[in-house]
A protein has these predicted regions:
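Bacterial N-terminal signal peptides that target proteins for export
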Residues: 1-10
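Bacterial signal peptide processing site
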Residues: 24-26
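Extended amphipathic alpha-helical interaction segments
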Residues: 145-225
């Protein structure tokens, strides 16, 4: 939705600029056009910077529900682990992790878990000045739409978008990327641990291939921030899955899925 709005804004600017140029002579038009196109690109980059860059964990978990995979008790990061996260880095990463766990509990209608993860997220969000996003009205919206997955995905995705946008607009881009990274890892962990033999789940291969695209994009997004120790440390932790994904094509064997699962388990154990 935000990307659609961004495109609409940019197009309206183009039309506006075109109208202004119609009354200028050719030389002035050319100079004005160059300046305006440069301004459009600047606006476009600013808009894109504030838009959640990957499919959200809610969208990923929805894929699992569509594969008719049952809810697995005990695979989410326990909400009580929040007491372990006292650094800015660990809190940001696990805000993303808990966002994925909230999506998992919500889309499988596990109400007590939804409450637990909302509480954990609210605690971290308060520390990061985002209490207005993960508030009582959000929980009420989730509760009122428990039986409508598409609406739940939209509600959660909006919350994640607002989180990313808030951080980006407040010069916390590195923290925003840690949140996105934590959510990606946990989404992958939930995906690969929905069964003792995930490779036997029909359709799981397609989900994991789609996540390779997200992973590659995520690495590209982190490149400008690799001088930040928090980003470089997190990206270094992703090395196991980077190595596995580097050798894959457009289809996965059972062994590929086992390798992905093992790599994600290693990474996840480091961040939670």
């Amino acid at each position: 939705m935000k990307k659609t709005v961004a495109v609409a804004v940019i197009l309206s600017l183009v039309f506006c600029f075109t109208g202004l140029m119609s009354c200028k002579d050719n030389s002035a038009k050319k100079k004005q056009k160059e300046g305006e196109l440069k301004q459009i690109k600047t606006i476009e980059k600013e808009i894109e910077k504030n838009v959640y860059p990957l499919p959200t964990s809610a969208q990923v978990i929805k894929m699992l529900t569509e594969l008719e995979v049952g809810y697995q008790i005990g695979i989410s990061n326990p909400a009580e682990n929040i007491k372990k996260y006292y650094t800015l880095e660990s809190r940001s990463i696990n805000l993303g992790v808990y966002g994925a766990d909230l999506s998992y509990a919500t889309l499988y209608n596990i109400e007590q878990k939804v409450i637990d993860y909302m509480d954990a997220i609210r605690t971290i969000a308060n520390d990061l000045n985002m209490s207005k996003i993960y508030n009582a009205p959000l929980y009420d919206s989730i509760k009122q739409n428990f039986d409508t997955r598409d609406k739940l995905v939209k509600i959660l995705t909006n919350a994640f978008n607002e989180t990313y946008q808030y951080m980006s607009e407040n010069d916390q881009q590195t923290l925003a990327l840690l949140v996105v990274g934590g959510a990606w890892v946990e989404g992958m962990y939930l995906t690969t641990n929905v069964s003792e033999a995930a490779y036997n789940v029909a359709g799981i291969s397609k989900v994991l291939i789609e996540q390779k695209k997200s992973f590659d994009l995520y690495l590209d997004l982190t490149k400008p921030y690799m001088d930040d120790p928090m980003i470089s440390d997190f990206v270094n932790n992703l090395e196991p899955i980077k190595k596995v994904y580097a050798g894959l094509t457009t289809s996965l064997t059972d062994q590929n899925i086992k390798d992905i699962t093992a790599a994600i388990n290693i990474i996840r154990n480091k961040i939670i």
